[in-house]
Structure formats: structure tokens, C-alpha cells
Amino acid sequence: WIEKETGIPVLGILPWLKEIFPPEDSLDLLERKQVNQIAEIEIAIIKLPRISNFSDLDPFFSESSIQIKWIEPDQDLGKPDVLIIPGSKQTIKDLEILNKTGMSTQIKAYAKNGGNIFGICGGLQMLGKSLKDPHEKESSNELGSYLYMGLNLLPIKTTFGEIKRTKQKEEIASWPEVANVKGFEMHYGESDLINKTNSDIISLFKNSSIGWVHQKKDKSFIGGTYLHGIFEND
């Protein structure tokens, strides 16, 4: 029927097999509800309006020791063990939503009180001090500027270029332990440490600057990476 109606040659149809094929970003996000009575760790994930690369979070749903809690930007954050800020199709606009709803204030308070935070791609960019978008790749000048303030929880600055970086990566992780990891990059922004001599900030990978973490004295951490698929390495 498909070939007849569309004129496109069809060899066959593959059924969707749960836990084998990755789900669609937005549709699956609305359907997933996890109730884990024996969970030891609660991970809260900010449900950004323009969330992307939802498959980054798939590994957590198969862990019996983890309870996932989705947090809308206008909801109470609570006190999760870890907070994840995922990727976004439009980082700056989603950052504006966090500011308008007061979620950014909650995140900063959570960090100040010893909360653990990890950002993926756009989430990493939001954690930084500033985001500059001169080519309007992630924003538009209707917001009034090409320079936007981040959450200022990591001492990094991000500039969005004209070319989107898409690359498969194999890296050697240096935190929390040395390990070989695989994943991919897919982003416009390039981030740099504001002070490269800051000994409190650890590069997540030995050979490239695509992720950093601040391991604080109270053992809590704030970090992030551009590497999608990082949690599939275990």
C-alpha cells in the first residue's frame, strides 16, 4: 500500500521493538512514566519545551536502582539526588523559559545547597556564564541582544558559530574514573573555560575540551558535556 500510494519502493516494514529502537523525542517523552518502588537514587530531569536527543536519557529507565522524575519549568524542583538539564533544539529560548518561570533560581539554590547537576549539550551551555549568538542560530534578536547570561554555575562561555559540529567520538574519560567512552557531538556552540588555570574545574575527557566538572569540597558536583550517548557507556 505504501509503495502504491507514495511511489517510493518499499522492501518491507520493521515493527517497533521496545528497548531496541530509540523512540521519538517528544512523543515518547509524554508517554514515559516510571514508578520504581525500590529505587535508591532519584534523578530529576528538566522537561525543557524544546528538549532534544531524548535517547541520551534512555539508559536510566532500564536501571532498577533509579527513579526518574520529570520536572516542568514551573514546578517545584524538590531535592533529587541528581538534576539533569538535557539538550535543547533552541538553547537560549529554553534558558529564557527557565528564567521566566523561576526555575533558574531554584537550580541555583539547589546547587548552593550541595545539589549534583549535569548538563548535556544545550544543558551544558545553560550552566555556563554566558552564551553569545551573533548568527542567530539558537535565538533571534527579538529578545534584544546577541549576548545572554547563563546560570553561571560553571566558568565557561559559549559562542554559537555558523557551522554545526556533527562527529562520532571516542574519548578517554577522566572523571569520575578513567574509562573509554563513545558518543557523538551535534551542536553549533563552542564552549571554553573562562580561566584555563582554574584548578577546581576538571576536564571530563583527557584529549578534548567537550566537557567539564566542578567537584566541590562537599563531594557534590556540577558538570556537563557535549557528548551525546555518554550514559550508554557502562
Annotate each predicted stretch with a short phrase.
Residues 1-40:
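Internal gly/pro-rich beta-alpha loop/helix module
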Residues 13-21, 46-50, 188, 226-227:
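G-domain G4 guanine-recognition motif of GTPases
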